[in-house]
Amino acid sequence: MGTPPRTFLILGCFLTGPLLTLCQLPLPTIVPNRNEMVVQLNSNFTLKCSGDSEVSWQYPVTEGSHRIDIRHEENNSGLFVTVLEVGNASAAHTGMYVCYYNHTQVEDGEVEGKDIYIYVPDPDMPFVPSLPEDQFILVEEGDPTVIPCRTSDPSAEVTLVNSLDKPVYAFYDSKQGFVGNFLAGPYTCKTMVKGVEFKSDEFLIYILRATSQLPVEIEALKTVYKTGETIVVTCVVFDNEVVNLQWNYPGKVKEKGLIKLDDIKVPSQKLVYMLTIPDVLVKDTGDYECTARHATKEVKENKKVVITVHDKGFIHLEPQFSPLEAVNLHEVKNFVVDVQAYPAPKMYWLKDNVTLIENLTEIVTSSNRVQETRFQSVLKLIRAKEEDSGTILWLLKNEDEIKRYTFSLLIQVPALILDLMDDHQGSAGRQTVRCLAEGTPLPDVEWLVCKDIKKCSNDTSWTLLTNNISDIHMEAHLDERNMVESQVTFQKVEETLAVRCVARNDLGAVTRELKLVAPTLRSELTVAAAVLVLLVIVIISLIVLVIIWKQKPRYEIRWRVIESISPDGHEYIYVDPMQLPYDSRWEFPRDGLVLGRILGSGAFGKVVEGTAYGLSRSQPVMKVAVKMLKPTARSSEKQALMSELKIMTHLGPHLNIVNLLGACTKSGPIYIITEYCFYGDLVNYLHKNRDNFLSRHPEKPKKDLDIFGMNPADESTRSYVILSFENTGEYMDMKQADTTQYVPMLERKEGSKYSDIQRSVYDRPASYKKKSLSESEVKNLLSDDGSEGLSLLDLLSFTYQVARGMEFLASKNCVHRDLAARNVLLAQGKIVKICDFGLARDIMHDSNYVSKGSTFLPVKWMAPESIFDNLYTTLSDVWSYGILLWEIFSLGGILYPGMMVDSTFYNKIKSGYRMAKPDHATNEVYEIMVKCWNNEPEKRPSFYHLSEIVESLLPGEYKKSYEKIHLDFLKSDHPAVTRMRGDCDNAYIGVTYKNEDKIKDRESGFDEQRLSADSGYITPLPDIDPVSEDELGKRNRHSSQTSEESAIETGSSSSTFIKREDETIEDIDMMDDIGIDSSDLVEDSFL
């Protein structure tokens, strides 16, 4: 049997294949004969390949593509057969399977043969796993590339996204992936399987730029080393990573050195190669070179660095100055030293063995590296001083060597004359002039004289002195301070001459001059100098006295009238009291006024007890209080007192204020005549009745009296002004002044102008005609009998009356500014009256007042806005009202016990500190205090609401009793009331009403006034029309007969005369002598 012809053909091709390219075998065949096939997941499949020569398989190699078995089979037909079997197929087996002849050449990883593409769809792995090297894609710039994100399912829809998760549009082939031109960067493929999104591995495309050169840099941390250290050299290749790098260095032959690819930074396209040589020797000195070659192009680049290795460290100095340096005073000078050293040395500057610290204010040292082994150190003198002279040492040291450099610093100082003085020696005319000079170098001293004083301004008039002159002697020497002391002695000075001392050194010359006076002229100059000194002392003393006088506090009225300038009333201005009118109806004749004891005296004036004759028909004789200034008062204080008078005339009458009765403003000092209050100020009254109060209220134990700051038995230590009847202080001179027309006072019995008023009927409380109330306490609230003592209802009554009085002031737009218990007086019947007693109080020595500039302020009573912002309103008076309540219910205790008025006090007030509840206050009363002390003024209650609140705490009958007394007061012929009506009869100012309707109008006007108390505008009471002349005549005819009866019916200000126990017959006789019927003598019960 012969060989088949096909066998010979194949054998012939093998023999001639290398020589004959036209002899080619047919492609192998694959069974199944398909281009692609889909295989179910986890199934088995078999591929059989046959060909005319030995064949092999090329199949996908990915992670998980194992379980592939290849075997060869015999075939009778002479074909070569190879079988590929895959068991448990997975998505990793998806790919191209190629059968090829063994002799086929492989080009770029691909072979020529028969192929079939197998899909193994896996819903849990839609993308075929890829090898790590397939995820980094290198591509030449401008060439297309393939992103091999293949799917295991041919029907899958795939999207390509970039690093920003934005889609990239390109052609997609499930067998290859995305094909196109892409920018450098990372890419990811996405697909959806049954509503679930899957992502492929990230593929990084790196573009190789077409370049004709390789940017290469070589870097060395150091170029100088010493033996035993480690050399580190780095070679950096930019812009292209496909390079081959080669090192050349002295130790390369012995393979000494470690080469490492440090890192790859794709964004900057940089490759870093590091050469490390440990334990270097001197012979490692030389060139270190790196050469980079492009992997695909004929591009080459090399760089080198010279490395020097020393046996040990070294220091070489190069100072830029000499061992002796001279610097002028105040000059700025730099001393520079250049250094070559390795390792880097530590450098120190020392002066006189003391280390100089860097960055001093006047000597600055600095050191810096110029190059790798070159350094520079600088010592800088800033405005050189004399004490900078000395020895300067510059010290350098490193691990292997120490070097020093020393130089001397000399500060050159210009010549300076420290002193030039003359020494008088006896009366014969011998005088010595001494000149003390210094400088560096030491100066030379010369002496010159000028005998013609008028021409001494010309240098040619000066003559140089020498020792050749017979009556002149000169000498010089160094003193213990190394200063030049030169002196010249003149044996006789017969006339005035000028002497000049000249000190000169290398930096210049200075001169000083003095005049030598003949002994005969010296005594005259001494007298003139003494007179001049005395004149200067007198002028300075006058200036000091004027300053002290101007800084002395001036009297100013605390009450102020305000006028709103904004709709909400929050903005206001003070009304100038001097612009208010003064009605002459208030004028009272001086001869109708007799002055008595001083009730109170202050820095600016005093309040005197007095007796007024003829203020009203029902009260021909009335005890009054007279306010006046001291004789030393200044014009500004007189103007302030006149302002107070005008404000009081503007306010009008009210039961709970100290009412104006009259005034004396003409032909003499200003007198303000006001009501007299029997019990004095409220503080004094509370102190005196404290024990009585505690005995009536045993539930209030007598605790330690720290809150009062005193011993109860020692009332002399109180800081309040007590309105006692002490005969202290001087009376104001009532005699006629030299420069003014003065109306003398009407002389009474025995011609006395000043009457020492005894305790008589005017001291006795009057009685009121009022209904009996159901409760005994209410009966005594407005009682005239002082023996009833002090009760808690009395304290509430005082509180209520003050609120009503302040409500009245607020309705008149009047701000008190000093509301305190010391400025609240108590009249008969326990009627409270608000006043301003500042004139009669020595506020400069009163601990309740704190100095603020040229004035004194009651800080503990003031609202925060008044203390810190100088803002005074009715609402700031509300704060003071709360403080007053604390005084009342502590029975006159000291405010803020234990606290001084200092920065701590102010900070506590700002932070919300408030006083605790006083011992005798109820919770309701303390709640009123807290409301008054609200830090926000607009949240404080008005006086109208305060009176309503306090009224609710009093018995129901109290308001009726109070309103009756108040109404009776407004109906009475009290001088404060009658002078506000019209001037109906010049001879008699009495009760002149048309009818009772006007009285009702006044009542209703008062109610309206209360409702408008916080309106911010002045709301005067309605005027009362006078009665007709006929009706007036009828009333006047009966007035003398019914004065007592009418006084009792009014129940307000008059009561019949009743002799008191301490009253004498002489008092009655005195009134009879002046023509006053004692039966007609009445007294205002509110005084």
UniProtKB/Swiss-Prot annotation:
Topological domain spans for side Cytoplasmic: 550-1087
Entry's localization field: Cell membrane; Cell projection, Cilium; Golgi apparatus
Record keyword Zinc present: no
Free-text description of this protein's post-translational modifications in UniProt: Ubiquitinated, leading to its internalization and degradation. Autophosphorylated on tyrosine residues upon ligand binding. Autophosphorylation occurs in trans, i.e. one subunit of the dimeric receptor phosphorylates tyrosine residues on the other subunit.
Gene Ontology cellular component annotations, sorted alphabetically: cilium; Golgi apparatus; plasma membrane; receptor complex
Catalytic residues, chain numbering: D818
A GO MF term: platelet-derived growth factor binding
Modified residues (Phosphotyrosine): Y572, Y574, Y720, Y731, Y742, Y754, Y762, Y768, Y849, Y988, Y1017
Function: Tyrosine-protein kinase that acts as a cell-surface receptor for PDGFA, PDGFB and PDGFC and plays an essential role in the regulation of embryonic development, cell proliferation, survival and chemotaxis. Depending on the context, promotes or inhibits cell proliferation and cell migration. Plays an important role in the differentiation of bone marrow-derived mesenchymal stem cells. Required for normal skeleton development. Required for normal development of the gastrointestinal tract. Plays a role in cell migration and chemotaxis in wound healing.
Protein's UniProt name: Platelet-derived growth factor receptor alpha
Species annotation: Gallus gallus
